[in-house]
Structure formats: C-alpha cells, structure tokens
Design a protein with these regions (language model features):
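Amphipathic alpha1 helix at the N-terminus of the CheY-like receiver
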Residues: 12-26
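Active-site residues of response regulator receiver
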Residues: 58-62
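Short amphipathic alpha-helix used as the core "switch/output" element in two-component signaling
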Residues: 68-83
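Extreme N-terminal starter segment of soluble prokaryotic enzymes
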Residues: 1-4
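A short, hydrophobic beta-strand element within the central beta-sheet of small alpha/beta folds
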Residues: 83-90
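The feature encodes the CheY-like receiver
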Residues: 64-66
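Acidic, metal-coordinating helix/loop segments flanking the phosphotransfer/catalytic sites
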Residues: 15-19, 32-56
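Conserved acidic carboxylate
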Residues: 8
Length: 90
C-alpha cells in the first residue's frame, strides 16, 4: 500500500484535499491510503523518518508561520524517500 502525506497550512484546504483524495482512492480502487495530513512540516518529516518507504507527498508551496516552505520540506523528504512522488500545490 502506497502512503500519501499531505502538508497544507490552511485547515479548510487540508480537509478538502484529504476528502478529495480519499474519494478518488475509493472510486478507482487504488492501493493507497492517507498516512498523514498535517499543517506542520516537522510532523511530516518525523512520520517519513519513522517509516521510510516510497510515498506520495502533496506539499503546499507557501507554509505560513513555519520555518520551511514546501520546497524545503521536499528536500528533507528526499533524505528518507529518494524515489517518492512530490506534488507541489499552490
């Protein structure tokens, strides 16, 4: 099963992305699941470090009130998941 991670600082957008992806996974019967939705990049990094396997990452480009943006988060994810799929959302 392919894990999906979502990092988005806007709670409403995060919920909408999660709902949309869950619906598409169910409709299409994909072998995937939402592993973590978070508004904080450090939570995503910790989860990926704890379970470093190939995943799909939806990363907000501009993370307000955080020390890193989506591109910096992608660089950190690459340290643990070099073959993962990074999708930048703006």
């Amino acid at each position: 099963m392919l894990p999906i991670y979502i990092c988005e600082d806007d709670a409403m957008i995060l919920a909408a992305q999660k709902k949309f992806l869950e619906k598409q996974i169910m409709i299409e019967g994909y072998d995937m699941q939402i592993a973590l939705c978070s508004r904080h990049p450090q939570e995503i990094i910790a989860a990926v470090a704890a379970s470093p396997k190939r995943g799909i990452y939806f990363l907000d480009v501009e993370l307000k009130d955080e020390a890193m943006d989506g591109f910096m988060l992608g660089q950190q994810i690459r340290k643990f998941d070099a073959r993962g799929f990074l999708i930048y959302v703006t």
